[in-house]
């Protein structure tokens, strides 16, 4: 009997999901992406060699693992082909193992132009998108006017829909944002060129997942971004345009929730955020700078510096509830090495002095102060440690306290960037 295991982020993204997916796919027959697009940036380090994936599932570096892109993912053909080419240049076979749902929405040049024009127009009030067209592509999907991967293989139908879409979007670009129009013929020609390359990789991903399930194969579901960026449950409006929480798995892959056996919540040992939006535990002092430097906290997709702060048990409790988390993977524990004291946020105090839980929108965070519990740090190095017993006592106490505060077990601890620098206490596929 196979198991279906989910790996998703519990914070604002950048928790280290790529490494853990790569580690666990040793036991998986297939890995599927079910939401987001090439705004994701999953960094894998294998034998010291770094690989960053944006759209292709992280299982691609494991020989024989099938990689699937589900209907909930927005696909930019140009970005996908660049990523495939880079991997092939490294000797990684991709086209034989990558399959893409025909129902996945396309990101095209006008989505990128709109995304960037809107952020520019917002000025200081910008959301902090990656500018890669993710939001506008999801808008077209929900408005039922979007083009999908399967449309690429019907030229006349595709051209007719594309013409209508460009009439609609170019009007905004030219008249409202004062940006140049997107050319119809150039866009059509580019898309038809990509169609020839993508056609052999197209597959009914939902049907394939159920075939694998019925055959008793282990399947990994790879989330992108983090729970606090969910369009419904995140710090709205400073969120992404997809459901990053567990509910997005079923809608984005076609595999119902009753078939999911274990949900692993990837959680950084401190907290980071890229772009705008509330961040109660953010540090503006030397400690924050130290975390950023040691943790190499720069976005793998945008290159933007990440904001850093103390561990926030409040948002993790919310993520555990929303996702029905089975177990936690605590990453980047080694970044905390050498700190004399470490703070954990255990609640938020509002203007009336009452301690409250996580709000459901960005405005409700205004005026909140984090309530901290101070713990002793440790001077010993935890980098590369592979057993719980080898960790300093203070590090073990920190892990135990997090478990107590959030009500979920820490099943995996990451002590470095390489797939081998990991402590596995309970294996999700066991």
Curated annotation (Swiss-Prot):
GO process terms (BP): 'de novo' AMP biosynthetic process; IMP metabolic process
GO terms for MF: adenylosuccinate synthase activity; GTP binding; magnesium ion binding
Cofactor binding remark: Binds 1 Mg(2+) ion per subunit.
GO CC aspect terms: cytoplasm
Top class in the EC scheme: ligase
Active site location: 14, 42
Binding-site residues, substrate: 300-306
Coiled coil: none
Superkingdom of origin: Bacteria
Pfam family for this entry, one: Adenylsucc_synt
UniProt xrefs under NCBIfam families: PRK01117.1, purA
Record's function text: Plays an important role in the de novo pathway of purine nucleotide biosynthesis. Catalyzes the first committed step in the biosynthesis of AMP from IMP.
Stated name of the protein: Adenylosuccinate synthetase
Originating gene: purA
């Amino acid at each position: 009997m196979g198991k279906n295991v989910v790996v998703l982020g519990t914070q604002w993204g950048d928790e280290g999901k790529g490494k853990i997916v790569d580690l666990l796919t040793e036991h998986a027959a297939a890995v599927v992406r079910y939401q987001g697009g090439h705004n994701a940036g999953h960094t894998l380090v294998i034998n010291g060699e770094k690989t960053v994936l944006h759209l292709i599932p992280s299982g691609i570096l494991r020989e024989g693992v099938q990689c699937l892109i589900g209907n909930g993912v927005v696909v930019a053909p140009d970005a996908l082909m660049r990523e495939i080419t880079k991997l092939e240049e490294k000797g990684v076979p991709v086209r034989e193992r990558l399959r893409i749902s025909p129902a996945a929405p396309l990101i095209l040049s006008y989505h990128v132009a709109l995304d960037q024009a809107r952020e520019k127009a917002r000025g200081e009030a910008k959301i902090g998108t990656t500018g890669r067209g993710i939001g506008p592509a999801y808008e077209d999907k929900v408005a039922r006017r979007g083009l999908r991967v399967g449309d690429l293989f019907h030229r006349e139908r595709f051209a007719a829909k594309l013409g209508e879409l460009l009439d609609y979007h170019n009007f905004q670009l030219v008249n409202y944002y004062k940006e140049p129009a997107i050319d119809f013929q150039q866009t059509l020609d580019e898309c038809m060129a990509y169609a020839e390359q993508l056609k052999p990789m197209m597959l009914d991903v939902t049907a394939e997942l159920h075939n694998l399930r019925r055959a008793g194969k282990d399947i990994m579901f790879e989330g992108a971004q983090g729970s606090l960026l969910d369009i419904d449950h995140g710090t709205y409006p400073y969120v992404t345009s997809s459901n990053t929480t567990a509910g997005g798995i079923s809608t984005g892959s076609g595999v119902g929730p009753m078939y999911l056996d274990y949900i692993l919540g990837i959680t950084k040992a401190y907290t980071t955020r890229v772009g705008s939006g509330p961040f109660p535990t953010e540090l503006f002092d030397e400690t924050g700078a130290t975390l950023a430097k040691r943790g190499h906290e720069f976005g793998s997709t945008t290159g933007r510096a990440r904001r850093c702060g103390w561990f926030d048990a409040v948002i993790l409790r919310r993520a555990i509830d929303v996702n029905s988390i089975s177990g936690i993977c605590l990453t980047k524990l080694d970044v905390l090495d050498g700190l004399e004291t470490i703070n954990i946020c255990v609640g938020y105090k509002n203007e009336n002095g009452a301690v409250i839980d996580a709000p459901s929108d960005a405005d409700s965070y205004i005026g909140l102060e984090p309530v901290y519990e101070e713990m002793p740090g440790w001077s010993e190095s935890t980098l590369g440690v592979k057993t719980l017993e080898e960790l300093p006592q203070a590090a073990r106490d920190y892990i135990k306290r997090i478990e107590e505060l959030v009500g979920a077990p820490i099943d995996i601890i990451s002590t470095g960037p390489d797939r081998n620098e990991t402590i596995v206490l309970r294996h999700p596929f066991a």
